[in-house]
Regions:
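M16 family metallopeptidases and their MPP-like homologs
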Residues: 50, 55-71, 77-81, 96-143, ...
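Gram-negative bacterial Sec-dependent N-terminal signal peptides
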Residues: 1-20
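Short, conserved secondary-structure transition motifs
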Residues: 160-167, 259-272, 379-391, 602-603, ...
Length: 944
């Protein structure tokens, strides 16, 4: 994608015509106000400051102009491996010190990512931690390399390989981008390989590779530091100069020149996928690099072709020809080249060849009709409104300003970016279609289930994919003890860097003023006013969750919500979509366990018109039989597709283990296919009539609104209904777990085992719930948790592991979840059991004090964005919490004693009374689990 889709703005002026006419006046040039100051240190380090005093938060972003494209053949994946290493250690922070410090001072964790062209590292903390994070990030950049040993490199290789297994090797269609990059770019081209690299190349990486990469690329003159938030610029400049200024400049790095891909003929490839249950076709065309003049028109082109009811590909392939249930695509722009992608899967029982006549028909229709000015302006308006989401946090601004500086040398390049998107014309869209897609060579890749080669596109050649074979004993963690490391060499400094800076000045934690009211029609309204941007976020919660559905037809509640998006009595689906988008608004309807949620985002001036559309959707559904049929077909296709996804399998089987067959939650959202087939349109109408009413509704709103406007808009949200409200039936109890049992779902040749360890636990309204969440924080709630520190950092078994309490009004669970390397399945479960079991007894007063400090200081980051505020209102309204519930919870946590902690852990953490669910390769792993002491594992799909 062009960077336009990711930039951040403080203000965008969009002038739209009235909703009823659904005609859009082209947006005027945006009025932007992202204040920033840029300066460069003598060593070449670019520094950007952005001051935002709306919240007591500061964020820092370190952007290095190096990604996988700077790697050499035989060392693919190295830039990403280096990203992992840089987080681990530095001379003055110590091993794991960066994450430990972030947690201790109230941050929400450090993070980063690597692309083909850059690597970014970032964190946000309360404002009094500014000097601490500047000190820490400088220590990473300048005082890192002496801490790296071959043991450190070898251990982190295992983590990265687990990430590859989780994201690529153990997922349906996971190898698609690998196949395309190998086919599209010649050997030696920087984009011939994926960012994650190959397992063989990762294995080959050594300590000298780390040193060479660091010396060449991680130098001040190739790095941008961006600081955003509530801080004093003069003080911050002094800090940056002190901590970063003495890092030596590196060699000059020449700029990258564009190297676009060239295809002289189309390529047709296939891959039999171990995890695919339905075929998929991807089509890829060579395109252009980021900021190329044509990149903006290509963004709009792919959006118009694939998004929405009137999109030409959807209109023909889904609605008319019914050969697929979904089409997607994106324009992937990178620094020196780009690709245009299209993805489509045939409906069940069809092959990929059957897609092509319909696809060609859709393209021909587009060639005939083109794109209208209204459609063009509507897409532009939607892109612009999306920008606001990125400016609500200090961290989002830091990341984007740094990224612009890396690639253009100008943090303010967003002005040019916006101007470029505004300049795209309908002729431009047609021109880039003709130049890059029509009759142009492409790469077709067919994926199909193993053993079903006949489903591929006719004439396809087998793609070369290197599949990992996980062998028992291979990939074992080295004898690794990071605490024992001794530095033989240190990097000199003009001052003692081992002393962590003190906290800055104290600050007042802002408290949101929560407005609440009950309207005459019974709707409860909750609001928080915020005028940082001219945006409003809202959510209407209706007590119409899937708990009210039928065991015989579990999908009724979810399908009702889905179908309400498919038109109204006055508007077809296409007309409704156009009416919403013409306002620059978004409206979505989703269904959860206990409620249905109508969520939206709108510009302040269009709030009334947007709410009018919400009313129309809720009160005057179209109940279109054709749309119902299409919806059911899509859900059936999605269920089939999920049957090969290990994570989806885990969720489905876990529901069965937790609840009896006569409980609605025994099933996932739509239930099994045979039950879905029986759902009728009349079922949805009846559910809507029974439960969609004012007495069941709570409205939450945050942003730049007035109370009078909200009250006026909501007064006739629901029509009067004469029949009484149907009482919620009492659901059966969840299955009781008194002893642990292991359940295994076999996915032959799985590269990882998906673990889900769970038991029933607290409801969200239980007085102990916030305290239980607190005690889980050091166990599995953060990167530095005991579970993650052991299984990922120390052992290299997983890319990540989390634990947590999840609750609603009537039920709750405690679970531990992870994906681990196949050949350490037993060892991972053993560690989890022991860590959870010993957690309470071994917990110390020092650890308790750190936990309290982290949770209490972290409150500063909990109320920064509109989404944060809306989430808080959601909890207040759903669970009848007091407006100051967070402050009350903080007091309870502060008062917790060590004995309180241990008692809570003993009561709620019970590793010997949990279901242990494993989704993985039974042939190699199941027998080994017998020695864990939980009896013989139960094979869940043994008859299949």
């Amino acid at each position: 994608m062009s960077k336009l889709q990711n930039i951040t703005l403080s203000a965008v002026t969009i002038i739209l015509a009235a909703c009823s006419e659904t005609v859009i006046t082209p947006p005027e040039a945006p009025a932007l106000d992202i204040n920033f100051e840029k300066f460069t240190l003598e060593n070449g380090l670019d520094v950007i400051f952005h001051v935002d005093r709306s919240d007591p938060v500061v964020a820092i972003d370190i952007a290095a102009h190096v990604g996988s494209g700077r790697e050499v053949t035989g060392r693919t994946g190295f830039a990403h491996l280096f990203e992992h290493l840089l987080f681990l250690d530095s001379e003055n922070l110590g091993y794991g010190g960066l994450d430990e410090m972030n947690t201790r001072i109230g941050g929400e964790g450090t993070n980063g990512f690597t692309t083909n062209d850059m690597t970014q590292y970032f964190q946000a903390v309360p404002k009094d931690g500014l000097e601490k994070i500047i000190w820490a990030e400088a220590d990473k950049l300048g005082w890192f390399i002496n801490t790296v040993s071959q043991d450190v490199v070898d251990n982190e290789k295992q983590v990265v390989k687990n990430e590859k297994r989780q994201r690529v090797d153990n997922q349906p269609y996971g190898h698609n981008l690998y196949i395309v990059s190998k086919a599209l770019y010649p050997e030696g081209h920087p984009y011939n390989w994926q960012v994650i690299g190959s397992l063989a190349d990762l294995d080959a990486a050594g300590l000298q590779d780390v040193k060479d990469f660091y010396a060449k690329w991680y130098v001040p003159n190739n790095v941008t530091v961006t600081i955003s938030g509530d801080f004093d610029t003069a003080q911050a400049k002094s800090m940056v100069e002190k901590y970063f200024g003495e890092i030596p400049r590196g060699d000059d790095i020449p700029p990258y020149e564009a190297q676009p891909a060239r295809l002289t003929e189309s390529l047709n490839l296939y891959h039999e996928d171990n995890f695919a249950t339905v075929p998929q076709l991807s089509l890829t065309w060579p395109a252009v690099e980021q900021y190329h003049p044509d990149a903006y028109a290509l963004d709009i082109l792919i959006s118009y072709l694939t998004e929405g009811k009137t999109a030409p590909l959807n209109e023909v392939m889904i609605d008319e020809d019914k050969v697929t249930s979904g089409v997607s695509g994106f324009n992937y722009t990178k620094e020196i080249a780009g690709e245009l992608y299209l993805f489509v899967s045939p409906n069940e029982g069809q092959d990929i060849d059957g897609l092509m006549p319909s696809l060609n028909k859709a393209f021909e229709r587009f060639e005939e009709n083109g794109i209208s000015q209204d459609d063009l302006d509507r897409i532009k308006a939607g892109i612009e409104v999306d920008f606001y989401g990125d400016v609500q946090s200090a961290l989002g601004k830091a990341i984007q300003l740094g990224e612009y500086n890396v690639f253009t040398g100008d943090p303010g390049f967003y002005k040019k970016d916006i101007a470029n998107i505004q300049a795209v014309s309908t002729d431009d869209v047609m021109r880039v279609y003709n130049e890059y897609i029509k009759d142009k060579p492409s790469i077709a890749v067919s994926f199909m289930p193993k053993g079903q080669r006949e489903l591929a596109l006719d004439g396809a050649d087998k793609a070369k994919v290197v599949e990992e074979v996980v062998v028992a004993g291979e990939g074992a963690a080295p004898d690794f003890n990071p605490a024992a490391r001794v530095l033989s060499t240190t990097t000199p400094s003009k001052f003692d860097r081992s002393i962590e800076p003190e906290f800055g000045a104290t600050y007042e934690l802002p408290v949101s003023d929560v407005w609440r009211d009950t309207l005459a029609n019974g709707i409860e309204v909750y609001g928080i006013q915020s005028n940082e941007t001219p945006l409003i976020n809202f959510s209407l919660r209706i007590d119409a969750g899937r708990e009210l559905g039928s065991v015989q037809k579990p999908a009724i509640a979810a399908m009702t919500a889905d179908l309400l998006e498919k038109g109204t009595a006055q508007k077809t689906t296409a007309e409704l979509e156009n009416a919403i988008k013409s306002l620059g608004s978004s409206i979505s309807i989703s269904n959860g366990d206990t409620g249905t949620f109508i969520s939206g985002t709108t510009l302040k001036r269009n709030f009334g018109q947007t709410i009018d559309l919400v009313k129309e959707m809720l009160n005057e559904p179209r109940w279109d039989a054709e749309e119902f049929s299409l919806l059911k077909s899509k859900i059936l296709q999605d269920i089939t597709q999920s049957e090969g996804n290990p994570n989806a399998i885990s969720a489905r089987e876990n529901a069965k283990l937790n609840y009896p067959e006569n409980h609605i939650f025994h099933y996932t959202r739509y239930g099994p296919k045979d039950k879905l087939e029986t759902v009728t349109l009349e079922d949805l109408k009846k559910f809507h009539s029974l439960y969609y009413r004012a007495q069941n509704a709570k409205f939450r709103i945050v942003g730049d609104f007035t109370k009078n406007n909200v009250i006026s808009a909501m007064k006739d949200m629901f029509p009067e209904k004469t029949h009484p409200i149907k009482e919620k039936a009492k659901l059966p109890a969840a299955k009781e777990i008194t002893t642990s049992k292991i359940y295994f779902y076999d996915v032959p040749e799985a590269k990882q085992s998906v673990l889900r360890i769970e038991r029933p636990s607290l409801t969200s309204t239980d007085p102990d719930f916030p305290l239980a969440e607190a005690i889980n924080f050091p166990l599995g709630g953060i990167y530095t948790s005991k579970l993650n520190s052991t299984l990922r950092v120390e052992k290299g078994y997983t890319y990540g592991i989390r634990s947590g309490f999840n609750g609603d009004i009537d039920r709750g669970t405690f679970n531990v979840r992870s994906s681990v390397r196949t050949n350490v399945t037993k060892e991972s479960i053993e560690l989890i059991r022991d860590i959870v079991g010993n957690y309470g007894p071994d917990f110390t007063q020092e650890e308790l004090d750190i936990m309290k400090g982290a949770l209490l200081k972290g409150q500063a980051l909990k109320n920064e964005t509109l989404s944060d505020k809306l989430r808080m209102l959601g909890e207040i309204s759903a669970y009848n919490y007091p407006a100051d519930y967070r402050a009350q919870n903080a007091k309870a946590i502060e008062a917790m004693t060590l004995q309180d902690f241990k008692s809570l852990a003993e009561k709620y953490l019970r590793p010997n009374a949990m279901n242990y669910l494993v989704v993985g390769d039974a042939a190699s792993q199941m027998d080994g689990l017998k020695s864990l002491g939980f009896g013989d594992p139960v094979l869940l799909n043994g008859a299949e």
